[in-house]
């Protein structure tokens, strides 16, 4: 820790306080995340340190770089590259009655998918994607923060400040208590974020797990074994759930064209193996008119 100096507190992350800091000798500005864990008496589990150290290998223009993992007494500090703006703040800053430029929506979504595909190829899930951990710079680049932390530290029900962790972007298989889930959970979250990029409003904003599920069901219909094999045997599925018919996604997400709505629907398919993958989504016709050569990952993809 002696290599870094804290400048100011910049927020409360899922796992602890986040500071803006500076590397003493290079002057590089960084984000310093102090990890507080439930079982702090025993210190940080070595498994968590191992897991999180592996994340230093995730080097991609659309993934926030983990620069260093430091221990101080029983505290763990994660040192990340610094970006000053997140997607939630940016969406909140757009004046009432105005919306994000449709081409920027497309560019951001494509870049998010690039980052997710990169991590998924390396068998790293996010599990907690939301606008607050999508960071943006002033050049149109968007980066995913906190990739892999859920596996290292778990996803807490509450932030350490007792603020409830948002459920708005959580996939239905997670909400229904599936013991096994995989990369499709991140695609679902990205779909809900896609809708929010277009409308500035969360697509499904539940205030409890059951309210969250019912908001999804009201729009997409209550799932059963016909549309999602074995859903009825998931731990938190109840046969007493109200049986809603499928509603209209297009009436809720008015700012997307036909291709955009088609891609969104494919990202919000109930049955996880049938849900479009990040890689497949990147080849969807919605992106045909996006100039991918200007995107930050173009150089590594040989676009």
Swiss-Prot record:
EC number: 2.7.11.22, 2.7.11.23
Major enzyme class: transferase
GO cellular component, one term: nucleus
A single GO molecular function term of this UniProt record: RNA polymerase II CTD heptapeptide repeat kinase activity
SUPFAM superfamilies given in the database record: Protein kinase-like (PK-like) (SSF56112)
Residue numbers carrying Phosphothreonine: 14, 161
Modified positions (Phosphotyrosine) in chain numbering: 15
Gene3D superfamilies: Phosphorylase Kinase, domain 1, Transferase(Phosphotransferase) domain 1
Location(s), subcellular: Nucleus; Cytoplasm, Cytoskeleton, Microtubule organizing center, Centrosome
Enzyme active site: 128
Catalytic activity: L-seryl-[protein] + ATP = O-phospho-L-seryl-[protein] + ADP + H(+); L-threonyl-[protein] + ATP = O-phospho-L-threonyl-[protein] + ADP + H(+); [DNA-directed RNA polymerase] + ATP = phospho-[DNA-directed RNA polymerase] + ADP + H(+)
InterPro entries referenced in this protein's UniProt entry, alphabetically: CDK (IPR050108), Kinase-like_dom_sf (IPR011009), Prot_kinase_dom (IPR000719), Protein_kinase_ATP_BS (IPR017441), Ser/Thr_kinase_AS (IPR008271)
Biological process, per Gene Ontology: cell division; G2/M transition of mitotic cell cycle; mitotic G2 DNA damage checkpoint signaling
Keywords of the record: ATP-binding, Cell cycle, Cell division, Cytoplasm, Cytoskeleton, Kinase, Mitosis, Nucleotide-binding, Nucleus, Phosphoprotein, Serine/threonine-protein kinase, Transferase
Amino acids binding ATP: 10-18, 33
Domain named Protein kinase: residues: 4-287
Role: Plays a key role in the control of the eukaryotic cell cycle by modulating the centrosome cycle as well as mitotic onset; promotes G2-M transition via association with multiple interphase cyclins. During G2 and early mitosis, CDC25A/B/C-mediated dephosphorylation activates CDK1/cyclin complexes which phosphorylate several substrates that trigger at least centrosome separation, Golgi dynamics, nuclear envelope breakdown and chromosome condensation.
Protein family: Belongs to the protein kinase superfamily. CMGC Ser/Thr protein kinase family. CDC2/CDKX subfamily.
Subunit annotation: Forms a stable but non-covalent complex with cyclin B in mature oocytes.
Protein name per the record: Cyclin-dependent kinase 1
């Amino acid at each position: 820790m002696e290599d870094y100096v804290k400048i100011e507190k910049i927020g409360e992350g899922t796992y602890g306080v986040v500071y803006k800091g500076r590397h003493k000798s290079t002057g590089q500005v960084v984000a310093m995340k102090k990890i507080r864990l439930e079982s702090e008496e025993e210190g940080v589990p070595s498994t968590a340190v191992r897991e999180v150290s592996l994340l230093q290998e995730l080097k991609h223009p659309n993934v926030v770089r983990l620069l260093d993992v430091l221990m101080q007494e029983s505290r763990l500090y994660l040192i990340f590259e610094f970006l000053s703006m997140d997607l939630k703040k940016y969406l909140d800053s757009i004046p009432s009655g105005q919306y994000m430029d449709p081409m920027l929506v497309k560019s951001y979504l494509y870049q998010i998918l690039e980052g997710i595909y990169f991590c998924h190829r390396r068998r790293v899930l996010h599990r907690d994607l939301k606008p607050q951990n999508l960071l943006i710079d002033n050049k149109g680049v968007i980066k995913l923060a906190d990739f892999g932390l859920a596996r290292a530290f778990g996803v807490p029900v509450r932030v350490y400040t007792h603020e409830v962790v948002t459920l708005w972007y959580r996939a239905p298989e997670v909400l229904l208590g599936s013991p096994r889930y995989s990369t499709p959970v991140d695609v679902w979250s990205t779909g809900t974020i896609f809708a929010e990029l277009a409308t500035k409003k969360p697509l499904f904003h539940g205030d409890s797990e059951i309210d969250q599920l019912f908001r999804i069901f009201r729009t997409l219909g209550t799932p059963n074994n016909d549309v999602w094999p074995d859903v009825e045997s998931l731990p938190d599925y109840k046969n007493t759930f109200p049986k809603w018919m499928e509603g209209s996604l297009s009436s809720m997400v008015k700012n997307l064209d036909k291709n955009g709505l088609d891609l969104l629907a494919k990202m919000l398919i109930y049955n996880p193996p049938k849900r479009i993958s990040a890689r497949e989504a990147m080849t969807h016709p919605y992106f045909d008119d996006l100039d991918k050569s200007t995107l930050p990952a173009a150089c590594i993809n040989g676009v």
